[in-house]
């Protein structure tokens, strides 16, 4: 491994992302594909870029990311969390700014399980009075 490479693990819902950061010119590679190829939705791309834009490092760092599990928004959130952790490893002074924006905290919300006798997690079968 290169000496000037920084690592962060991010998780969100059922997705997990491994993020490697090194000085470069702003190239983002996710599972051997570019950011534009991997995420069709602009909202997901924005979520991924948020921590980099906050600390003005979009053009200064190259990112190599592998992400598994979950759907589009979960993967985007996991990547954002991983980038945030890698940035903190890169420069600890960024922690306060990232924390204020809410990127450091792991979003612990998970899908609630379906219960027996109900149609979904909380949706009850229709009630008929007569």
UniProtKB/Swiss-Prot annotation:
SUPFAM superfamilies: Ribosomal protein S5 domain 2-like (SSF54211). Keywords: Ribonucleoprotein, Ribosomal protein. GO terms for biological process: translation. InterPro entries: Ribosomal_Su5_D2-typ_SF, Ribosomal_uS9, Ribosomal_uS9_bac/plastid, Ribosomal_uS9_CS, Ribsml_uS5_D2-typ_fold_subgr. GO terms for molecular function: RNA binding; structural constituent of ribosome. Binds ObgE/YhbZ (AC Q8ZLS5). HAMAP family: Ribosomal_uS9_B (MF_00532_B). Belongs to the universal ribosomal protein uS9 family. This is Small ribosomal subunit protein uS9. It comes from Salmonella typhimurium (strain LT2 / SGSC1412 / ATCC 700720). The lineage of its organism: Bacteria, Pseudomonadati, Pseudomonadota, Gammaproteobacteria, Enterobacterales. The gene is rpsI.
